[in-house]
Swiss-Prot record:
Its EC number is 1.1.1.8. Substrate binds at K140, R289, N290. It comes from the Eukaryota. Keywords: NAD, Oxidoreductase. NAD(+) binds at G29, S30, G31, N32, W33, G34, F60, F117, K140, A173, R289, K318, Q320. InterPro entries: 6-PGluconate_DH-like_C_sf, 6PGD_dom2, G3P_DH_NAD-dep, G3P_DH_NAD-dep_C, G3P_DH_NAD-dep_euk, G3P_DH_NAD-dep_N, NAD(P)-bd_dom_sf. Residues 1-23 are annotated as: Disordered. This is Glycerol-3-phosphate dehydrogenase [NAD(+)]. Disulfide bonds: none annotated. The active site is at K225. GO terms for cellular component: cytosol. It holds the Pfam family NAD_Gly3P_dh_N. It comes from Cuphea lanceolata (Cigar flower).
Amino acid sequence: MAPSELNCTHQNQHSSGYDGPRSRVTVVGSGNWGSVAAKLIATNTLKLPSFHDEVRMWVFEETLPSGEKLTDVINQTNENVKYLPGIKLGRNVVADPDLENAVKDANMLVFVTPHQFMEGICKRLEGKIQEGAQALSLIKGMEVKMEGPCMISSLISDLLGINCCVLMGANIANEIAVEKFSEATVGFRENRDIAEKWVQLFSTPYFMVSAVEDVEGVELCGTLKNIVAIAAGFVDGLEMGNNTKAAIMRIGLREMKAFSKLLFPSVKDTTFFESCGVADLITTCLGGRNRKVAEAFAKNGGKRSFDDLEAEMLRGQKLQGVSTAKEVYEVLGHRGWLELFPLFSTVHEISTGRLPPSAIVEYSEQKTIFSW
């Protein structure tokens, strides 16, 4: 669908009587969650007079088995046939394989790609985005640098020179795609007006979004829970039962909170009770892709690598938990914290073959007595 076909634009915006500036939104990423995000946003830009109707979605171009380009198929069918089959994205979503072209007119940028690609994407966009643009990261993960861990929102802010909020929550994408009720949390820093604009852009009757002034807390919840989900998958693969899984989730939540507050003392306790915290942890440990692949890893006795299982089971989607466990392990080792975080440490050591999957319950929590 070409932008010129969006005949609804003028009708909606002129009939509203709104004369102020209109924001343009681009979604950078088009996987499972990126496609669902575009669908949510596209529903609201049609209704909200302060937004242009069209939503651009940058697609990392792929050739489908049919020989067709993924971008062409999305624009012809209004459906991401590879990463979100069977779901219409909205007639105002336009897929674009050219990253710079996709973002050039946007003043609201939504980033939703695997976290390991973000530094490269940001470097490609340096000097190419509108002055005063706002960013929102839906990305779960961190970059580990010599000077310490760098959250993805900070990476975006530092490289692009723009403010970046985050959105995290108990959000299994396929359930939101079919409009099952769920919640999410926007984390912001100081500017509540911008946060409320993001809340407005994502909120629907089936997707409830709230905002909290705690970017690091919200983002770390979304990042660290994937490590705990890997542990939960090991428990499932070894058929250890619900009591064991509940214990692993509790210990994991405790380590999530402790790690977050050691890195960023400003992180708020209440953030862990938002959708981005305990709710996201529960849903990811019950139904997410990290749990699913970790279960298969444990059933195979750790004899098949996560890379092999990911390629076989996820149809091009990427795991986040294994790479995040590695990144967190590096931080723990560098700061001398390994013994303080036995669950996080053990997940990485199992994932890399240093320990068997059964080791997930073979450590002591005695040294994890934190004051918070």
